[in-house]
Amino acid sequence: MIKKEMLAMILAGGQGTRLKILTKNNAKPAVPFGGKYRIIDFTLSNCSNSGIDTIGVLTQYEPHILNSHIGIGSPWDLDRKRGGVSILPPHMRNDGGNWYMGTADAIYQNIMFIDKYDPEYILVLSGDHIYKMDYSKMLQFHKEKNSDATIAVIDVPIEEASRFGIMNTNDDDKIYEFEEKPEQPKNNKASMGIYIFNWKILKEFLIEDSELEDSDHDFGKNIIPSLLDSGYNLYAYSFNGYWKDVGTIESLWQANMDLLDTKNPLDIYNKNWKIYSVSPSKPPQYTGPNAIIQNSLVVEGCAVFGKIQNSVLFPEVEVGSNSIIQDSVIMSNVKIGQNVIIRKCIIGSNTIIENNSVIGNSDDITVIGDGEKIKTNSIIKN
């Protein structure tokens, strides 16, 4: 048995239906972000930077791209003989098997994997949020409070609090009540879906919950309320940095645009907290003689002959002469012809946009899926 103080379990099986065609053939955590990343890179990098070297990634919906991206974990220094990263899909057991039926059930189905490391603590994470957090500081808080379960929270506008699970706390941050999406929230401390549990206690509750036919097998709906009802010590750990749930087209687009703000607290350029990813070998970016690039992220392999403003371009995007790209996210290997206008769009990978086309407007966000071909002189405005 390999003893680990704490290991991380990343919930990465979400379908992300609100991202529409962007997750048609792709799990939400594997959606491209920020020119060179995938969403899950932030959670994996947080683990690596926090000194966590044993991670289980729980996959389910369309896992192929995600599995290939993570591989053996080399970009995050997780290619290890003792620990490292393990992909954990639903599987058949002697007593049967099923899809993960909820967040808690996903952990329950992997009790044997966790017990192999005999951890004191288990860190449960979502693989589909954009943020940077030092989990070691959260663990220190957990220990200092002698907590049985610690939940990371972030202050949200009170008018939006009804969209979240809300933690009602005493002055010492001890949670006395949890409300799942309350109609009239008492405060604005929203759960971030980041939990640290004492493993022996959580294991007991997971086993009990698995036997309840009327349970949703969910941390927010079942496990957290049960712990509170049983008198265990639960504390809220406040997080003050940038955090974005990119579960909608609007939030994904906005999070990409946030990277263009020099005052953005996410700061992907911080050398002390790098965001790691798989980095394909591409040639340098080429900027044509009449090209203009303003306030944009344009990465390796791109060839720009037109005008780029307030946009994010992934590898190997080609932009023809006299074309204008504004307020848009252009994913990898997109070929854009001449005299094309693209405004406030998300364009999926491997798409071809032929000459003289107009896509998007300045109001709503227009989304074009992967591998589409937009013919010459097309006009698409949602």
Swiss-Prot record:
GO terms for biological process: glycogen biosynthetic process. Homotetramer. One of its GO terms (molecular function) is glucose-1-phosphate adenylyltransferase activity. Pathway: Glycan biosynthesis; glycogen biosynthesis. This is Glucose-1-phosphate adenylyltransferase. CDD domains: ADP_Glucose_PP (cd02508), LbH_G1P_AT_C (cd04651). It comes from Clostridium novyi (strain NT). Pfam families: Hexapep_GlmU, NTP_transferase. Alpha-D-glucose 1-phosphate binds at Y100, G165, E180, K181, S191. InterPro entries: ADP-Glc_PPase, ADP_Glu_pyroP_CS, GlgC_bac, GlmU/GlgC-like_hexapep, NTP_transferase_dom, Nucleotide-diphossugar_trans, Trimer_LpxA-like_sf. Its EC number is 2.7.7.27. Belongs to the bacterial/plant glucose-1-phosphate adenylyltransferase family. It is an enzyme of class 2 (transferase). PROSITE patterns: ADP_GLC_PYROPHOSPH_1, ADP_GLC_PYROPHOSPH_2, ADP_GLC_PYROPHOSPH_3. Keywords: ATP-binding, Carbohydrate metabolism, Glycogen biosynthesis, Glycogen metabolism, Nucleotide-binding, Nucleotidyltransferase, Transferase. Involved in the biosynthesis of ADP-glucose, a building block required for the elongation reactions to produce glycogen. Catalyzes the reaction between ATP and alpha-D-glucose 1-phosphate (G1P) to produce pyrophosphate and ADP-Glc. It catalyses: alpha-D-glucose 1-phosphate + ATP + H(+) = ADP-alpha-D-glucose + diphosphate.
